[in-house]
């Protein structure tokens, strides 16, 4: 069903919301996302759900699969995102034809990232330079079959091709009008954390002299705060601002990740209420960028009153009394408060073994086999995280980017951007210049460790304070042409409130095994393997761009390299390294090499150098399992002082 038709059916005084998911990076993550979508769809009843589209159509197959699953299995109207620049027209055509075949009626037409330079697109001329081109194309080819959404930017949009222009939402209005006049039916905004920015934008749009935007549905996008780091990263990538009062609260809460999540929930709830009170009934729906996680979304819906409003609408539409009672029970609307008490059970997760299988509910669940089975009858309190079932459903709520649990639907850098440089070409060239030999690359890695530059292609922010504690070792390792893109020191029981190593709830202790991840040449890798392959204290994973893979880890093995022990809680493993996660990142890491190379024209010294690195280098992760030996890893790597 079309989104605009669904919105038209919302009675006055009621509210709606929708969910956004992104394609997981691993097969088991996709399986667990299916379970999570089932639970969220049944418990929270979104009006529709959308699926993001990877850079240059990189996730096309999985994105379409998820949209089909929403539409046909979960009976939730699906909206498929499509980006048009830097994408072959054949991919767009196939996606649209397949969407129509599966009964998907809604498309969010976006521009996407432009090519880095004229060589990047292999000389092809794209028919789609802007989102409006895609809107026109869909309308011309499919008439009114698809309901088309477009993006708007309450705080303004900065074009990476024209970085000297400052953000100005008013300057963007003519482009928004052009998209609507080309055939767009609804608008979803960029995320924001300043409610006043949206209120001001919405009021201006509604009263624009053209009258073109007076009645079109505008849905504000909401992204819960999952961690301090992810908030900083997302706001930088999206260009949205954060209220100083919110940043003060978050800074005071570091490193308590649970407190940061709760502060985020409170802020979003207040933001929703403020918007609802100041838009004269013109906006009564919100689009939640879930990041494939559910707990914060559930809490926001409950605490803001959106869930209750949505329930009233669904209740009025239900004629089957038995179905009504079942749904009410599942939403816990008739349940006493005692049923929400949290239950703690002993953990079955051994964390100190060299390379144990990953456990969630049983010892038979490995990295490749674990599935989240909390689906059909799980009540809303489970999505909130209450009780033992809630803990099982939200087992991955403390995410850790690409070093997180590969079974999690949220595994990876949860920003939806994929393996890109995250910088406009002009800014990237200022950061990294024009390297012509390997010593230039070594220098860039060392400058990043010393904070002389703010980013390298694989790490788009300054080094953490934790990394600085091992800077002298990393500088020497990079000096040996082992270029590091990830690392951590050994930690034995630091307080969870420690300003450098702490994370998670208060009153706990955190532990870390030392590891390092770097790009090395083939000869150095061979020498390392010859010496350390059979050492029980060392696990390594190595792969290159030719699909060659080497490891001394057991099949389906995984190493928990960061874990926390907290009062009244099961042990939480926030950082896990396994073959499945290494291979997912391996592919992306070499794509980043390619993105960097594409900054430079063909046959230039810099382009040739980086292409040689793609062909000759191996990505290697080395773990030292004795977390009580702070220097163990560096002895293995022969980095002595």
Swiss-Prot record:
Enzyme Commission no: 1.5.1.53
MF GO annotations: FAD binding; methylenetetrahydrofolate reductase (NAD(P)H) activity; methylenetetrahydrofolate reductase (NADPH) activity
InterPro entries in the record: FAD-linked_oxidoreductase-like, Fadh2_euk, Mehydrof_redctse-like, MTHFR_C
Record Pfam families: MTHFR, MTHFR_C
Residues the entry annotates as binding NAD(+): 20-25, 52-53
Residues the entry annotates as binding FAD: 52-53, 81, 111-113, 153, 172, 179
GO biological process, one term: methionine biosynthetic process
Active site, renumbered: 20
Catalytic reaction list: (6S)-5-methyl-5,6,7,8-tetrahydrofolate + NADP(+) = (6R)-5,10-methylene-5,6,7,8-tetrahydrofolate + NADPH + H(+)
GO cellular component term of the entry, any: cytoplasm
This protein's record includes keyword NADP: yes
Cofactors: FAD
Domain of life: Eukaryota
Uppermost EC category: oxidoreductase
SUPFAM superfamilies, A to Z: FAD-linked oxidoreductase
Listed pathway(s): One-carbon metabolism; tetrahydrofolate interconversion
Annotated positions binding substrate: 113, 190
Disruption phenotype: Leads to partial auxotrophy for methionine.
Keyword entries, A-Z: FAD, Flavoprotein, NADP, Oxidoreductase
PANTHER family: METHYLENETETRAHYDROFOLATE REDUCTASE, METHYLENETETRAHYDROFOLATE REDUCTASE 1
NCBIfam families listed in its UniProt record: fadh2_euk
Function: Major methylenetetrahydrofolate reductase required to generate the methyl groups necessary for methionine synthetase to convert homocysteine to methionine. Performs 15 to 20 percent of the total methylenetetrahydrofolate reductase activity of the cells.
Family from the record: Belongs to the methylenetetrahydrofolate reductase family.
Name of the protein this chain belongs to: Methylenetetrahydrofolate reductase 2
Highest classification ranks of the organism: Eukaryota, Fungi, Dikarya, Ascomycota, Taphrinomycotina
Gene, per the UniProt record: met11
